[in-house]
Amino acid sequence: MLHVLRPGYAGAVNGHSNNGNDDETSTTPTLYIFPHAGGDATYYVPFSREFSADIKRIAVHYPGQRDGYGLPALTSIPALADEIFAIMKPSAPPEGAVAFFGHSMGGMLAFEVALRFQSAGYRLIALFVSACSAPGYIRYKQIKDFSDNDMLDLVVRMTGMNPDFFEDEEFRVGVLPTLRAARIIAGYNCPPETTVSCPIYTYIGDKDWIATQEDMKPWRERTTGAFAIRVFPGDHFYLNGNLSELVCDIEDKTLEWCDRA
């Protein structure tokens, strides 16, 4: 079962049907899934289906996306992490440990949320970062100060898109949340001494030009534990063609940690 956590709706957790069963216990490890910018939780249903019932999966649904109209716009990665952690956090740390998976922008958010779980005394299994540059190594930093119109102009210049498309209000409303997320991504950083104690395992496509291997290697500086990088064939969304191998690696590392604990 893939559970979906919707910020802005306290206590609302919905389920998507999965091939596994729902025999989770209080000690079952939980994997929180943080989607990419512009992606919603339902995008990760196929990803979730590859896991066994030995791991509980909870995907985070961001404000301002489908079924989330009217919620506050993203202002920063740390602010969104605060909001999500406040909803995730039970009154006391659970018996089961937690792990985090984030793709693209979701990798930054997963890191920030993991820091909050760590400070609150939770047992962290690992942070799994997919196709996401390490803090301080994010490209296109100049766009962090762009207005909405500046962002739309940049899209026209970079893609050759007809600017008349942006005269359509419905089209603007549809595209601006993703562009605003890109602006937030470009402005994200954190102090160099900020680290998690759990291992960080990173994954990247060999043809990814948005987050390259060189951009991801500095994630090793963000953990006092183990670090590894694994390269798959594919582009920024390499995971779509490598679901079984990716999930197998994540599940093996998660359950190995639980066996040792």
From Swiss-Prot:
Transmembrane segments: none annotated. Keywords: Hydrolase, Lipid biosynthesis, Lipid metabolism, Virulence. Disulfide bonds: none annotated. One of its GO terms (molecular function) is fatty acyl-CoA hydrolase activity. The keyword Hydrolase applies. Gene3D superfamilies: alpha/beta hydrolase. It holds the Pfam family Thioesterase. It comes from the Bacteria. The active site is at S104, D208, H236. It catalyses: a fatty acyl-CoA + H2O = a fatty acid + CoA + H(+). GO terms for biological process: lipid biosynthetic process. Its EC number is 3.1.2.-. Belongs to the thioesterase family. Involved in the synthesis of both phthiocerol dimycocerosates (PDIMs) and phenolic glycolipids (PGLs), which are structurally related lipids non-covalently bound to the outer cell wall layer of M.tuberculosis and are important virulence factors. This is Thioesterase TesA. The lineage of its organism: Bacteria, Bacillati, Actinomycetota, Actinomycetes, Mycobacteriales. The gene is tesA.
